[in-house]
């Protein structure tokens, strides 16, 4: 292999990985997809060493004749599930249809340059109604749902506008949280101020006027990085997972400061401390709110439009299962009364198991359906309530306990959601791993035959035979153990 061609292949491999990292793929998926790209590019896995980090990817190729090390910076971090799906599909298509390097590079360029599937205002409206769906899950009425959505839409649009003017990302988060909370407070006056209520029609007066303040800034909560952080830590990618966690913490902290400043202005802080989050709705209302939240947040994640109904169904499954297990007679609801932690685990697991089959119907990675489906369960309010408790400490007995209680509840719920999403897929992926390897090997052999390259049955049989020996060894180990 010529040095120029080898360097070109390494560049393409790094570009494949950087597209995934900048689109918020978890580290395991990045490595799996890069290894599949290596197979297409004809790079021997024995000579390749990959290093994946939040800001940089590195690949080293060392054989008897060459030793090259190349780097690729990852700077434009965002969330694009459509990009993840396209890159995954490209690596399979490139092998099956025997792409040239030029074709593969053009396909990467097309994916990189493709516009997002939703306009900024569509994303703002979707994210705003998603916050309204959260508000329903916290017990608000449908009038408050629309007030919360309106405040969130305007706050979110401001959040997207400020970085285009050169504003720091975390400052933009704080400002947008401040504005959204003030707007929600202004709508609450319509239902609490007697003078305003006198001139308002009854359908515009909410019986839960303060609930929109609780949910209006939840468009900021970074649900995908939270889940990826837990997944990376569980998979052993500690460094990348830790960076994701710190970035998430800074975003939530900026949001908490924005809300704290808004509280100083409006003088109302019950939504950040004592306002109840226990809903008392019918399950059909939970289902509608979950579908709205799942589809709304999917616009933020740039999901393919055709998957919006699928994600809506996933959100309904996740939230309704969670609520049935979480709620119960102790809080005046129908359910098993087992708590938020167990409910979150059950809801995420139910969706993950369903998507194991459904992903083959829609030809997308598992992550592209499960993550938007479980986002409506992310405990964003508990997260910023925990940080707000620490920000507002005055030395009163019990303040640390309140903050730690919210922090622990939020952490356990997030861990359980990530476990519910990851574990069923992990077991299934290991179950079919040999099948996928055989499929990939067969495609590579067929590709070589089409190109007129000589493929000996012995070369293929060595790998298959090694697989059979491994299975026999496993069976022998089990028999010996028994």
Language-model segments: which ranges?
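Alpha-helical membrane-inserting segments
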Residues: 133-134, 138, 154-163, 179, ...
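Structural signature of hydrophobic alpha-helical transmembrane segments
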Residues: 122, 137-151, 208-222, 273-290, ...
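Hydrophobic alpha-helical transmembrane segments
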Residues: 124-125, 145-150, 171-175, 214, ...
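Generic multipass alpha-helical transmembrane bundles of integral membrane proteins
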Residues: 219-227, 247-334
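Soluble N-terminal domains of membrane-associated systems
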Residues: 1-106, 110-112
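Core alpha-helical transmembrane segments of integral membrane proteins
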Residues: 116-198, 206-229, 305
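Conserved mixed alpha/beta catalytic, RNA-binding, or beta-rich assembly cores of soluble enzyme
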Residues: 128, 148-168, 172-181, 292, ...
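C-terminal transmembrane helix-loop-helix hairpin of multi-pass membrane proteins
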Residues: 195-203, 210-217, 228-253, 324-482
């Amino acid at each position: 292999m010529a040095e120029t061609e080898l360097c070109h292949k390494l560049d393409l491999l790094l570009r494949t990985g950087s597209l995934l990292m900048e689109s918020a793929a978890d580290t395991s998926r990045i490595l799996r997809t890069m290894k599949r790209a290596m197979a297409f590019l004809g790079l021997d896995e024995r000579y390749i060493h990959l290093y994946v980090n939040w800001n940089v990817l590195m690949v080293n190729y060392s054989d008897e004749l060459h030793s090259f090390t190349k780097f690729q910076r990852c700077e434009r971090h965002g969330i694009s599930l459509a990009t993840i799906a396209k890159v995954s599909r490209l690596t399979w298509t490139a092998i099956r249809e025997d792409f040239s390097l030029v074709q593969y590079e053009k396909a990467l360029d097309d994916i990189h340059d493709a516009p997002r599937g939703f306009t900024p205002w569509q994303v703002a409206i979707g994210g705003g109604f998603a916050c309204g769906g959260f508000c329903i899950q916290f017990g608000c009425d449908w009038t408050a749902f629309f007030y919360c959505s309106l405040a969130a839409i305007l706050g979110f649009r401001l959040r997207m506008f400020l970085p285009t003017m050169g504003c720091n990302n975390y400052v933009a988060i704080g400002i947008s949280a401040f504005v959204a909370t003030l707007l929600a407070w202004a709508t609450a006056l319509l239902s609490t101020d007697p003078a305003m209520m006198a001139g308002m029609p009854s359908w515009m007066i909410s019986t839960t006027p303060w609930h929109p303040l609780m949910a209006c800034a939840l468009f900021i909560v970074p649900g995908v990085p939270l889940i990826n952080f837990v997944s990376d830590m569980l998979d052993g990618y500690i460094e990348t997972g830790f960076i994701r966690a710190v970035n998430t913490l800074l975003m939530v902290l900026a949001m908490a400061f924005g809300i704290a400043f808004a509280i100083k202005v409006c003088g109302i802080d019950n939504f950040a401390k004592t306002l109840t989050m226990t809903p008392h709705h019918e399950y059909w209302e939970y289902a509608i709110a979950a579908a709205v939240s799942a589809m709304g947040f999917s616009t933020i994640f740039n999901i393919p439009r055709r998957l919006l109904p699928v994600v809506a169904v996933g959100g309904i499954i996740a939230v309704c299962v969670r609520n049935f297990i979480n709620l119960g007679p102790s809080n005046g609801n129908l359910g098993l009364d087992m708590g938020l932690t167990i409910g979150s685990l059950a809801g995420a697991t139910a969706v993950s198991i369903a998507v194991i089959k459904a992903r083959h119907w829609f030809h997308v990675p598992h992550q592209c359906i499960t993550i938007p489906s479980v986002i409506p369960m992310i405990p964003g309010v508990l997260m910023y309530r925990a940080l707000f408790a620490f920000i507002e400490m005055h030395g009163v007995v019990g303040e640390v306990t309140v903050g730690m209680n919210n922090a622990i509840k939020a952490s356990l719920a997030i861990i359980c959601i990530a476990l519910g999403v990851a574990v069923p897929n992990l077991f299934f992926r290991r179950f079919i791993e040999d099948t996928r390897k055989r499929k990939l090997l067969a495609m590579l052999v067929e590709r070589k035959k089409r190109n007129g390259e000589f493929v000996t049955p012995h070369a293929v049989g060595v790998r298959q035979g090694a697989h059979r020996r491994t299975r026999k060894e496993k069976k022998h180990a089990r028999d010996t153990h028994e």
